A protein has these predicted regions:
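Acidic, surface-exposed loops and disordered segments
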Residues: 1-139
Length: 139
């Protein structure tokens, strides 16, 4: 069915957002992770250098960074769901311009993708993938 049908029929739909304020996000991650994992010196390094690094990103670099991170999160989530016997489907084709308003989420957060989640009685078959030798070239 269509993406809209999947969303309507799924018991759960996850909307995955990225935080477009990379500097603020980096500081928060450094603070939270730093308490457990970083020396004071390391924490200071991350608090000063990561925000400055992100500030140098142009719009395309920022968009690529956010999309890549969203993809990694989605992949891990889908693998964890699959491991628990729960079906899921990643949806990229949706009207991103309305999601923040409908869900009342600050515009700072960018909708990246939706994941429909649920159990199914159908025997799931893997979707077609190109053969490895068509996508990887050994040199």
């Amino acid at each position: 069915g269509s993406n809209q049908d999947q969303i309507k029929e799924a018991p759960v739909t996850i909307a995955l957002f990225t935080d477009t304020d990379l500097a603020k996000r980096a500081r928060k991650i450094a603070r939270v992770a730093g308490v457990r994992n970083f020396s004071d010196e390391q924490l200071q390094f991350y608090m000063q250098n990561l925000p400055a690094e992100f500030a140098r990103y142009n719009d395309q670099q920022k968009s690529d960074y956010l999309a890549l991170n969203a993809g990694l999160v989605a992949m891990n989530l889908v693998l964890a769901l699959t491991d628990q016997g729960i079906g899921s489907n990643i949806i990229l084709g949706f009207d991103k311009s309305k999601v923040n308003e409908v869900l009342e989420i600050d515009e700072r957060f960018r909708p990246e993708l939706l994941i429909t989640v649920g159990y199914t009685d159908e025997k799931l078959e893997p979707s077609y993938r190109l053969p490895v030798d068509e996508i990887i070239e050994k040199r």
